[in-house]
């Protein structure tokens, strides 16, 4: 059933709740926890049989500055430094008001989850993700998005939030003053139930699962594998457009250039940041891997067959095995062992004439850090200023990967309080959006994505939206 707007108020016989939240991923769950901490009742409406969403499919890593756990790790950081990193990655095209709001809100939100709700966080050690100037990536000890969702759901339920699963919201009810009066949602038997509310938060993510919208707005990803949650159907944007709400950054998205194929598993970009390289079917490097895994998706898809090989050595393998997603991919047969360059060339399928020379590029590039243009045996040259810490040493390990679309970074335009904006820049009285349903802080292109921006927007946005709703309810809307 298509998302639609219904003018009026749901039947008076329908249950009433102060706050309804569409989506029980990280954004919705954090908002619910924050609302319950303030004593406000809320209901999360989740389309799936249990909370999951894009968060559960992610690595679950959340960037945050100046948290208690980061300080204990001896890392000096600040919201201002984090904001500078965000804008540098986005070439200063990210929405300034959201960069400031999120970089300031995420640390306190993470500390509250740990101190008040017993969600343990660690700071990842040993490497930096592209664009981050210090170690600020937080994770639950399991280092998976699924484990993060489990902890957030536990905390939300313990705080007294209600989570209604198998409830796909298809209707937003609105009065003549554009005030949200309730929602309609489809149950497993195709019946439609209604819920009246005083405020509504859209935490239902983006449009990556909507093939038509992807083809229109993200043509580079038209034929890419979608590795996100299928519930990302663009409902929030459809509702917003029907209400004449503004949208922003709809060409922004997070891709990933290291999706193991055919296993269908995410391979951490930490392997590239620690000295790994990507080679195409001709044995050629074709981009600077340290620029970011999001834009790497486009580079990989542009290679012969739309695939590449992520190549690394034993020292990097040790780091890789600290990530559960990698271990699952390895168990599924994604990791190939190559005793020397000739075996690696045979695996990749390089032309026999060039195989040894091409694979020698692994050593050549790790030895040269001069930033000069280099020619790949007749291919176009490009400037590569990547500085390697050391040379890769045999045996080599290789994983066949493709580029994938993970989630979109554009959506409904919002102010710093996560209130949805109309075309005239005024805010709807009681409609809020955050996380993937709203514009993020990655600007309007794939290269603007700083690692962790998705969960930054979800967690910080969820906390901010909840606090905005708390103030709205105090004012009786």
Question: Would you name each region that the model predicts?
Answer:
Residues 140-194, 198, 243:
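Helical element adjacent to the flavin cofactor pocket in flavoenzyme catalytic cores
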Residues 237-241, 246-356:
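An anion/pyrophosphate-binding glycine-rich loop and adjacent beta-alpha core
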Residues 45, 326-328, 410-477:
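C-terminal structured subdomain/cap of oxidoreductase catalytic cores
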Residues 171, 357-441, 445:
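A glycine-rich dinucleotide-binding beta-alpha-beta segment and adjacent secondary-structure elements
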Residues 4-11, 47-162, 168, 279, ...:
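Conserved N-terminal/central alpha/beta ligand/cofactor-binding core
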Residues 1-19, 37, 471-474:
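Extreme N-terminal leader/targeting segments of oxidoreductases
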Residues 188-191, 195-260, 455-464:
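Glycine-rich loop(s) and the adjacent beta-strand/alpha-helix scaffold that form part
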Residues 19-44:
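N-terminal Rossmann-like FAD-binding beta1-loop-alpha1 element of flavoenzymes
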């Amino acid at each position: 059933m298509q998302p639609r707007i219904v003018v009026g108020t749901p039947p008076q016989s329908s249950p009433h709740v102060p706050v309804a939240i569409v989506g029980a991923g990280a954004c919705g769950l954090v908002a619910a926890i924050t609302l319950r901490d303030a004593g406000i009742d809320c209901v999360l409406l989740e389309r799936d049989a249990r909370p999951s969403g894009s968060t559960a499919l992610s690595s679950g890593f959340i960037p945050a500055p100046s948290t208690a756990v980061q300080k204990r790790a001896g890392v000096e950081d600040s919201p201002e430094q984090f904001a500078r990193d965000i804008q540098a990655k986005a070439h200063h095209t990210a929405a300034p008001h959201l960069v400031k709001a999120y970089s300031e809100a995420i640390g306190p939100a993470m500390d509250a989850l740990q101190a008040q709700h017993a969600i343990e966080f660690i700071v990842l050690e040993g490497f930096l993700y592209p664009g981050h100037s210090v170690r600020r990536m937080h994770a639950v000890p399991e280092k998976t998005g699924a484990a993060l969702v489990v902890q957030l759901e536990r905390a939300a339920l313990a705080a007294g939030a209600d989570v209604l699963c198998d409830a796909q919201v298809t209707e937003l009810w609105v009065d003549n003053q554009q005030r949200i009066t309730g929602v309609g949602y489809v149950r497993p038997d195709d019946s439609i139930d209604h819920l009246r509310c005083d405020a509504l938060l859209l935490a239902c993510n983006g449009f990556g699962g909507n093939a038509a919208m992807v083809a229109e707005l993200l043509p580079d990803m038209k034929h890419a594998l979608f590795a996100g949650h299928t519930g990302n159907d663009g409902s929030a944007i459809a509702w917003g457009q029907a209400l004449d709400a503004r949208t922003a950054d709809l060409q922004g998205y997070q891709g990933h250039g290291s999706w193991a194929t055919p296993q269908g598993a995410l391979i951490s970009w930490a392997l590239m940041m620690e000295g790994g390289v990507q080679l195409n079917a001709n044995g050629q490097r074709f981009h600077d891997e340290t620029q970011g895994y999001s834009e790497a998706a486009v580079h990989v898809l542009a290679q012969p067959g739309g695939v590449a090989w992520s190549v690394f050595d034993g020292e990097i393998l040790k780091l890789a095995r600290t990530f559960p997603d990698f271990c699952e991919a390895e168990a599924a047969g994604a990791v190939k062992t190559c005793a020397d360059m000739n075996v690696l060339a045979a695996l990749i399928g390089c032309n026999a004439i060039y195989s040894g020379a091409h694979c020698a590029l692994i050593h050549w590039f790790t030895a040269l850090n001069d930033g000069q243009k280099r020619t790949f045996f007749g291919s176009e040259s490009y400037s590569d200023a990547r500085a390697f810490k050391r040379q890769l040493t045999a045996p080599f390990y290789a994983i066949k990967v493709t580029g994938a679309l993970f989630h979109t970074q554009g959506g409904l335009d919002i102010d710093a309080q996560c209130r949805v904006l109309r075309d005239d820049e005024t805010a709807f009285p009681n409609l809020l959006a955050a996380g993937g349903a709203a514009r993020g802080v990655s600007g309007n292109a794939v290269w603007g994505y700083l690692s962790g921006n998705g969960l930054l927007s979800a967690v910080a946005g969820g906390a901010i939206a909840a606090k905005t709703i708390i103030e709205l309810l105090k004012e009786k809307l």
